[in-house]
From Swiss-Prot:
Molecular function per GO: DNA binding
Name of this chain's protein: Probable transcriptional regulatory protein MARTH_orf271
Alphabetized UniProt keyword annotations: Cytoplasm, DNA-binding, Transcription, Transcription regulation
Subcellular location: Cytoplasm
Domain of life of the native organism: Bacteria
Organism of derivation: Metamycoplasma arthritidis (strain 158L3-1)
Keyword Iron: no
The UniProt record lists the keyword Secreted: no
Biological process annotations from GO: regulation of DNA-templated transcription
Family listed: Belongs to the TACO1 family.
Amino acid sequence: MSGHSKWATTKNHKFAQDAKRSKMFQKFSKEIIVAATLGGADPDSNPALKLAIAKAKAKSMPKANIEKAIAKVAGGSKDGANYVSYLYSGTAMGGVTFLISCLSDNFNRLSSNIKHYFTKHNGQLGKQGAIPYVFDQKGIIEIAKSDAAEDELMMVALEAGASDFFSEDDSFIIYSEPTNFQVLKQTLDDNFKIENYLTAEVTYIANTEVDVDKAKLEQIEAFVSLLEDDDDIQEVYHNAYCEDN
């Protein structure tokens, strides 16, 4: 359980687009509304909602926004019932693989837009719904070093089923299998007074990376920004890596 976590660099690429905070919060709200609609507005009995809330909190979404999204469903709104999750993958930018997570109430619109984005950038779409072999789905929890002592945190995390543990410059990063994420996070909640997790979500991590230069990375980030501007697209992942970035 040593070395450098890929998440430490991946998150910098992935969240380079997060300056558009309003758009980001809108997408978190949609995810919360859909989860609450499908499984109920009580996060204690709805794991999907609990996960969506944890993810939003970790990205500093205001508590009032989260409560408003939940209250909308509790008040009888059925907006979330029309949304369906979709997963797209494809290659572009000279062999870089992209994985795109979507929540849409209009499959035809979404499908047409995705095809347009990849065609415009000389890309090729993979099979809809398939996860490329270059990505692994993992639970990720990142905690500021000021919030916990390393030895105690590592011991508690491993006993709760963590699959890996890394100490970075300013934070601890804990990996888990997706099926064990909720148990792990609840255990940390019970044992530590962590006000704000830096990251708390089930996400995709590249296990095989494509090395690119800064110029190519800028093109990739522009493509990611284009994708994330689409209201139907929730998350965009890629396996490009720039050593000089």
